[in-house]
Amino acid sequence: DYKIIISNYHIVICKNVIYKYMSSLKKISLKDIAEAAGVSTALVSFVLNGKKKEYRVGEETAQRILKIANEMNYQPNLAAKSLRSGKTKTIGLVVSDISNPFFSQLTRVLEDEATKQGYTVLFGSSDEDASKMNHIVGSLLNKGVDGLMIVPCENSEKFIASLVNDNIPVVLFDRYFPEINVSYVALNNFNAAYVSTKYLLDSGYNAPCMVAYDVNLIHMKERVRGYKKAMSDAGKKKMINVVFLKQDSPKKSADRLLPKMVESGADAFLFGTNMISLACLYTIKDMGQEVISKIGLVGFDGNPVFDFFYSPISYIRQPIDVLVQKALGILVDNISNGNTVQSVLAEGEFIEMAP
């Protein structure tokens, strides 16, 4: 016969192991934490909901509760919490194209800023398709998001208006619809295009041409308007030249239109977006070094690809951090206090790239 001797120490160790194993199998409750910490369930609730100062919970007690909750792998019941508060602490983001570096950066910055305020971001990409945008927004609302930040696409006015009429907290980003009374945050596109065009003229270029998308969206219309105003103010109204690329096939449009512009005297290009820049740079490269060396180039938003092009490309840098902080601030305020329409137009920074 064998004798098994188990000390009190080993019994405690075994109990802890068994307890942790059992804890992993069941949902840990506030009551479980309270029993382990030797305090009331209410006290645990105050600490875990960030109300320890409000209810004057001692720091040592609060830290003990947090430590035990962590050791027990406590996961809050978000569904129950949202039912009590009516909030899920989630925000829906819809961008037009997540592969666009500008919108990728927007998503990254928003995730960071939202986390600081206790929010999680769910996002989707509309691919500039109104029906797809509507579907994504519907899915986000079904998931219970507290509010929406949307980069609207063409022909989405009625849908955006319906969200506003339903009192859903919405902030439009980068683009907006002047006829709809809804909050928005965007670049001052008119000023940005005006400054960019003036830079080309002041640099000695005689006939800058603007390249835009053939879309009926405010950010593009304002950029075209800024270009035209700068040309007019410089006494070059008759030399205003805007070419429009098809948004679904920009490279094909650029190959067809840009050589004609150069042949007709265009000596510089203002690109309406960074994606337009990328499409056009390939076309300009194919025109040969003689053309490249003489053409002035300015775009919107930087891109790592610009560093490898044969000619310097100056650009308007959008203050993405400021834009996101403003938009998130408005959205959170509307979620907490009800919809109040606010609008922000931020100024861009012109970045001159030396030859």
Where are these regions (language model features)?
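N-terminal helix-turn-helix DNA-binding module of bacterial transcription factors
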Residues: 1-87
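Structural motif
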Residues: 122-142, 193-194, 242-263
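Flexible loop/turn connectors
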Residues: 255-355
